[in-house]
């Protein structure tokens, strides 16, 4: 019997189970009806770009990107994640503010 059950093996469910296990709970069970990350998370194509509409979402995306490296170090397994870089253009001042937030 577990004290915590996480339902859904997508990006969010896996993250919740991982962080609960690291922080406080050693008996976390994750339930997924199909294959891990086979639902909505699969359709996201693994894109974790830092540019988001709010500062909090930008911070979360940057944390997620860093987490892939941590997972490889902790597990010794490759996540397959690659930082590829990119270009962003700003035609308006508010867009420039968003870009400066991630620099």
Task: Describe every region a protein language model picked out.
Residues 46-103:
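Dinucleotide-binding Rossmann-like beta1-alpha1 core, especially the glycine-rich loop
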Residues 21-42:
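Glycine-rich FAD pyrophosphate-binding loop
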Residues 13, 37, 95:
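Glycine-rich nucleotide phosphate-binding loop and flanking beta-alpha elements
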Residues 1-2, 25-26, 84:
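Short coil/turn connectors at secondary-structure junctions
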Residues 1-12, 29:
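Beta1/beta-strand and adjacent pyrophosphate-binding region of the FAD-binding site
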Residues 6-7, 19, 35, 51:
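N-terminal transmembrane alpha-helices
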Residues 7-10, 32, 44, 83-85:
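A secondary-structure boundary/capping signal
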């Amino acid at each position: 019997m577990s004290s915590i059950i996480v339902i859904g093996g997508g990006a969010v469910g896996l993250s919740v189970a991982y962080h609960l296990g690291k922080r406080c709970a050693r008996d976390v069970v994750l339930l997924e009806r199909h294959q891990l990350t086979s639902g909505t998370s699969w359709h996201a194509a693994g894109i974790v770009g830092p540019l988001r509409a709010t500062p909090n979402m930008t911070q979360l995306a940057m944390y997620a990107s860093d987490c892939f490296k941590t997972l490889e170090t902790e597990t010794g397994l490759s996540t397959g994640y690659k930082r590829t870089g990119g270009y962003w253009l700003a035609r308006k001042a508010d867009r420039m503010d968003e870009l400066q937030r991630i620099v």
